[in-house]
Amino acid sequence: MHSLAEHPEVMSRTLGRSIQGRPIQALITATKSEVVYFFGRQHPPEITGGLAMQSFIDEVFSDSDLANEFRARFMLVLVPLINPDGVAAGHWRHNMGGRDLNRDWGPFTQPEIQSVKRLIDELDDAGIAPKLMLDFHSTQRSRFYTQMPEDFDEELDFARDWLDRARLRMPDFDFLYDPRKPSGQENTKNYFYATYHIPAITYEIGDEVDRAELRRTSPIFAQEMMRVMLERD
């Protein structure tokens, strides 16, 4: 996402350093009263998740009327490479501390997650309200881990509305809407829902999804995300 750092609306900020000293970079837009978070590459080998995030975010920063309206309303925070050491070393899931970073959202023992948490706390202290968190990953089959429908008022069930709309536009793309009850697992999704009671979704793309299919479908997911978010008060 290096080209995005050159976007006129984006500020690049080093949040901290990994265990081996690599920067944890965030891309941040202008301050608004509401913020949407996008995270990626907590698990090093999950390539399709990273590629999906790239195409998704490219659509969010496009010059369409929809994208411009979305960026005018929401502050956006992107941390696309949370585990740079693991990526460099070819690790399966862990950082150089031997920790799965997507199980450190609670203990906050690792410098990579501590760096991201400091920014979240900073925006909290400034009164900026989180409205959505998407965490991009890969797995065997494309699926979206969400909260349960009963966790929100029916008219505020973002995940259901978002994924239903996306499916209508691409019925040939195989993915699962996979609501889960809150658990004790200390991952990003559970942390954001427990702390802020907002839609917090693990966006999983199948390991074998064709790259051209990612480029076709990710912008549609982004467009429908923006539409649903803009409809909410």
Describe the role of every protein-language-model region.
Residues 1-9, 15:
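Non-catalytic propeptide/linker segments at domain boundaries
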Residues 25, 180-196:
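Short glycine-rich, acidic/polar surface loops and turns
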